[in-house]
Amino acid sequence: MEPPVQIFRGEPGPTCSPSTCLPPNGSGWFPGWAEPDGNGSAGSEDVLLEPAHISPVILVIITAVYSVVFVVGLVGNSLVMFVIIRYTKMKTATNIYIFNLALADALVTTTMPFQSTVYLMNSWPFGDVLCKVVISIDYYNMFTSIFTLTMMSVDRYIAVCHPVKALDFRTPLKAKIINICIWILSSSVGISAIVLGGTKVREDMEVIECSLQFPDDDYSWWDLFMKVCVFVFAFVIPVLIIIVCYTLMILRLKSVRLLSGSREKDRNLRRITRLVLVVVAVFVVCWTPIHIFILVEALGSTAHSTAALSSYYFCIALGYTNSSLNPILYAFLDENFKRCFRDFCFPIKMRMERQSTSRVRNTVQDPAYVREVDGVNKPV
C-alpha cells in the first residue's frame, strides 16, 4: 500500500488551493500532498479551484470501491490464511509467503471503513490513537507487501535456476523466518509512523486531520525526504530486483525443455512460477500510478486541475483494490487453492465427490472383477 501522509480535510471556503481541495480520505495520508498551511508547500503556484467543480459522484464511487475492497479483501484474505493453516499440503514455502501477503492485505482492508467515513465527512472523527494505528497499518502493508513479493520472486528464481540449492533454501521454516524478518524491517517505518502520526486541528478550516506531524520549520524538507525514500526503497529497488529475477528465469525456462526429472514436477514448477509472476505484475500495475503521481507532485510538477485531482483519487483506490485481488487470482490460477476454497465453501458437496471417486477407484481395483476381451468389467 501507499504510505500515509496527509489525511483529511474539511469543507473549504468559497475557494481553495489545489492541495486544500484534496479529498479527505484515507489515501490523504499518503506522503504525497504537502500541507498548504505554511508547514509545507504545494511545489507550484496555487491555482484556485471551486469545490463545486469536484463532483460528489467521485467521492461516492470511491466510497463504494472501498466498501467492496473491505468485504472482498477481508473475507478473501482471511480464507487464504485459513486454508494455509488448515491443510497440511498447503504449507509450502511459496504459500508461507502468500500467507504473509494475505495478512498484510487483510490488515489494511480493516482501515477501509475509517477511510470511507472520512471521505464522506471531510474530517477525522476517530481520535488520535486510532489515527496512529491506521497510518501505521498503511505503512506496514506497503512495505511488507512489496518485500514479500520480492522474496517470492527470489524464491522462484532459486527454484528455477538453482534447483539443488533450492532443496536447502526453500523450506517452510526458512520462509517463516524470512517473513518475521520482513515484519521487523517494516517496523522501522511502521513504528516511526506511530510516533509521528497524530491528529491536528486545522483552524482555518475548522476540521481535524490525521497525518504525519513533521516539525513546522522543516516540514517541506521532511515531506520530500519521506516521499523520495518511499519511492526508492518501497518501489524502485524491489521492482528492479523482481525484474532481474524474472528475466533470469525466463532465459532459463527458454533454454531448458525439462527443468526437473519429472514432467509432473516441471508442470508444477512452471505453474507456481506463473502464479507468482501474475501476482507481482498485478501489484506493480495497481501501485505504479500512485507512486509516480506522488513523486511528480513532490517535485512540484503536478497540474492542479479537477482532472488531476480525480486521477489522484482513482490511483489511490486502484492501489487499495490490489488487496482484494490476490485471493481471486489464487482461486483462478492455483488448483490447490481452488480445491481448498471449494472444500471450505461446499464441504458436503466435496465430501460426496470424494466418496464417489473413492468408490469408482475401489471398483476398478477390486480383484473380484476381471477384464474381458471386449473391455467390459464382469464379476468372476
Swiss-Prot record:
* Major place of residence: membrane
Glycan-carrying positions: N25, N39
This protein's membrane topology, according to the annotation, is: Multi-pass membrane protein
Q: S-palmitoyl cysteine: lipidated where?
A: C345
Q: Which cysteines are disulphide-bonded? A: C131-C210
Choose any GO biological process term that the UniProt entry carries and state it. neuropeptide signaling pathway
Which InterPro entries would you find in this protein's record? GPCR_Rhodpsn (IPR000276), GPCR_Rhodpsn_7TM (IPR017452), Kappa_opi_rcpt (IPR000452), Opioid_rcpt (IPR001418)
Check the record and name the Pfam families matching this protein. 7tm_1 (PF00001)
Q: Cytoplasmic side of the membrane: what ranges?
A: 86-95, 155-173, 248-274, 334-380
Topological domains (Extracellular): residue ranges? 1-57, 120-132, 197-222, 297-311
**UniProt entry tagged with the keyword S-adenosyl-L-methionine:** no
Molecular function (Gene Ontology), one example: G protein-coupled opioid receptor activity
Q: Where in the cell is it found?
A: Cell membrane
Q: What residue intervals traverse the membrane?
A: 58-85, 96-119, 133-154, 174-196, 223-247, 275-296, 312-333
Query: For this UniProt entry, what's an example GO CC term?
Result: membrane
Q: Which family does it belong to?
A: Belongs to the G-protein coupled receptor 1 family.
What does the UniProt function comment say about this protein?
G-protein coupled opioid receptor that functions as a receptor for endogenous alpha-neoendorphins and dynorphins, but has low affinity for beta-endorphins. Also functions as a receptor for various synthetic opioids and for the psychoactive diterpene salvinorin A. Ligand binding causes a conformation change that triggers signaling via guanine nucleotide-binding proteins (G proteins) and modulates the activity of down-stream effectors, such as adenylate cyclase. Signaling leads to the inhibition of adenylate cyclase activity.
Summarize subunit and interaction data from the UniProt record for this chain.
Answer: Interacts with NHERF1. Interacts with GABARAPL1.
Q: What is this protein called?
A: Kappa-type opioid receptor
Q: Which organism is it from?
A: Bos taurus
